[in-house]
Amino acid sequence: IRINSLNIDFTDKVVLDIGCNAGGILFNIQDKVKYGLGVDYDYKIINFANKVAKTEKYNNLDFYTVDLNSDNFSVINNYSDQEQKFDVIFLLAVCMWIDTWEELIEWTRKNCEVCVFETNGKPKQQDKQLAKLQQVYNSVELINDNSADDDFYLRNDIQGAKRKNHPLRKLYICR
């Protein structure tokens, strides 16, 4: 759902997906990108992503286990076989899980041309994430105000306390 709302040409781009889960975003654009790097803290899903990439012969994709609560962000650069900045960094619905999320947003600004960012957490958390994006990036464009990779978040029958605990996430392109 999220990738379809983007107007980004991924042809020959170097792409990083932070919090890549099982690699779905990168698998969907692997035929276009020059190189894709996915990182996530869960070694089991990274192992799965690597099995899929190997089976499908996606030689332009790599997946690594990185715990951004304990590892320095610069470790990501060590995994990339590219010397330049990333053209695009995906940072989708992960900030509420990272203690130093504000520093991570600053790191993305220094290491990419475009950041595709999805807010997550309670409304106040999402507001803080947006404020940080606006502080760090020159342009923050709202792409979708009900972004989700799970139809649960898009259901109209979710109201009251359930909606409060599962607020709609917002998708931004930051430059």
Where are the language model's segments positioned?
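A short SAM/SAH-binding and catalytic strip from SAM-dependent methyltransferases
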Residues: D87-T100
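Conserved class I S-adenosyl-L-methionine
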Residues: K13-N21
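Conserved SAM-binding loop
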Residues: A49-N50
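Conserved SAM-binding loop of SAM-dependent methyltransferases across substrates and taxa
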Residues: A22-V33
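Conserved SAM/SAH-binding beta-strand->alpha-helix loop
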Residues: D42
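Conserved SAM-binding strand-loop segment of SAM-dependent methyltransferases
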Residues: Y58-N69
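Conserved alpha-helix/loop element of class I SAM-dependent methyltransferases that forms part
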Residues: I1-D12
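Conserved beta-strand signature within the Rossmann-like core of class I S-adenosyl-L-methionine
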Residues: C112-P123
